[in-house]
Amino acid sequence: MKIRIGHGFDVHKFGAARPLILCGVEVPYETGLVAHSDGDVVLHAISDAILGALALGDIGKHFPDTDAAYKGADSRVLLRHCYALARAKGFVLGNLDVTIIAQVPKMAPHIEAMRQILAADLTSELDDINVKATTTEHLGFTGRKEGIAVEAVVLMTRKHD
């Protein structure tokens, strides 16, 4: 069996007059995230982790913010595309670990719904998907409630014939 590890990181600032979407879940908050797509910073980090594990670049290469086709794009569609690229190379998700770094809003009420969506989109078992949240204790831009950062780590596996 061949394994690959990928790490993804993304940041978006608050300020868009749109819903806050994280892992495909609408999280109640006063503002959304500024982005070319729907601003789902979590799915962007996961997509980058998958692409990175397979040496396929990053989401900016695959979905450039200079391309009008991706304006307001549903990040779940982008994630599923990245995962399809991995599957085409014979890889499947072993497990996923995500850390959402945000002072606001509270993530705990939404974590299970996020995990369910990720398991469905990545055709994985729920116990292979972990989503957790933390704050920076009011330090830095996330602590000042200016935006959200996310780190994602994936283990991708391929079984040899």
From Swiss-Prot:
<protein>
    <recommendedName>
        <fullName>2-C-methyl-D-erythritol 2,4-cyclodiphosphate synthase</fullName>
        <ecNumber>4.6.1.12</ecNumber>
    </recommendedName>
</protein>
<keyword id="KW-0414">Isoprene biosynthesis</keyword>
<feature type="binding site">
    <location>
        <begin position="10"/>
        <end position="12"/>
    </location>
    <ligand>
        <name>4-CDP-2-C-methyl-D-erythritol 2-phosphate</name>
    </ligand>
</feature>
<comment type="similarity">
    <text>Belongs to the IspF family.</text>
</comment>
<feature type="binding site">
    <location>
        <begin position="63"/>
        <end position="67"/>
    </location>
    <ligand>
        <name>4-CDP-2-C-methyl-D-erythritol 2-phosphate</name>
    </ligand>
</feature>
<dbReference type="GO" id="GO:0008685">
    <property type="term" value="F:2-C-methyl-D-erythritol 2,4-cyclodiphosphate synthase activity"/>
</dbReference>
<keyword id="KW-0456">Lyase</keyword>
<comment type="function">
    <text>Involved in the biosynthesis of isopentenyl diphosphate (IPP) and dimethylallyl diphosphate (DMAPP), two major building blocks of isoprenoid compounds. Catalyzes the conversion of 4-diphosphocytidyl-2-C-methyl-D-erythritol 2-phosphate (CDP-ME2P) to 2-C-methyl-D-erythritol 2,4-cyclodiphosphate (ME-CPP) with a corresponding release of cytidine 5-monophosphate (CMP).</text>
</comment>
<dbReference type="InterPro" id="IPR020555">
    <property type="entry name" value="MECDP_synthase_CS"/>
</dbReference>
<comment type="pathway">
    <text>Isoprenoid biosynthesis; isopentenyl diphosphate biosynthesis via DXP pathway; isopentenyl diphosphate from 1-deoxy-D-xylulose 5-phosphate: step 4/6.</text>
</comment>
<dbReference type="Pfam" id="PF02542">
    <property type="entry name" value="YgbB"/>
</dbReference>
<feature type="binding site">
    <location>
        <position position="12"/>
    </location>
    <ligand>
        <name>a divalent metal cation</name>
    </ligand>
</feature>
<dbReference type="InterPro" id="IPR036571">
    <property type="entry name" value="MECDP_synthase_sf"/>
</dbReference>
<feature type="site" description="Transition state stabilizer">
    <location>
        <position position="135"/>
    </location>
</feature>
<keyword id="KW-0479">Metal-binding</keyword>
<dbReference type="GO" id="GO:0019288">
    <property type="term" value="P:isopentenyl diphosphate biosynthetic process, methylerythritol 4-phosphate pathway"/>
</dbReference>
<feature type="site" description="Transition state stabilizer">
    <location>
        <position position="36"/>
    </location>
</feature>
<dbReference type="GO" id="GO:0016114">
    <property type="term" value="P:terpenoid biosynthetic process"/>
</dbReference>
<comment type="subunit">
    <text>Homotrimer.</text>
</comment>
<feature type="binding site">
    <location>
        <position position="10"/>
    </location>
    <ligand>
        <name>a divalent metal cation</name>
    </ligand>
</feature>
<dbReference type="GO" id="GO:0046872">
    <property type="term" value="F:metal ion binding"/>
</dbReference>
<feature type="binding site">
    <location>
        <begin position="58"/>
        <end position="60"/>
    </location>
    <ligand>
        <name>4-CDP-2-C-methyl-D-erythritol 2-phosphate</name>
    </ligand>
</feature>
<feature type="binding site">
    <location>
        <begin position="134"/>
        <end position="137"/>
    </location>
    <ligand>
        <name>4-CDP-2-C-methyl-D-erythritol 2-phosphate</name>
    </ligand>
</feature>
<dbReference type="InterPro" id="IPR003526">
    <property type="entry name" value="MECDP_synthase"/>
</dbReference>
<feature type="binding site">
    <location>
        <position position="44"/>
    </location>
    <ligand>
        <name>a divalent metal cation</name>
    </ligand>
</feature>
<feature type="binding site">
    <location>
        <position position="144"/>
    </location>
    <ligand>
        <name>4-CDP-2-C-methyl-D-erythritol 2-phosphate</name>
    </ligand>
</feature>
<feature type="binding site">
    <location>
        <begin position="102"/>
        <end position="108"/>
    </location>
    <ligand>
        <name>4-CDP-2-C-methyl-D-erythritol 2-phosphate</name>
    </ligand>
</feature>
<feature type="binding site">
    <location>
        <position position="141"/>
    </location>
    <ligand>
        <name>4-CDP-2-C-methyl-D-erythritol 2-phosphate</name>
    </ligand>
</feature>
<feature type="binding site">
    <location>
        <begin position="36"/>
        <end position="37"/>
    </location>
    <ligand>
        <name>4-CDP-2-C-methyl-D-erythritol 2-phosphate</name>
    </ligand>
</feature>
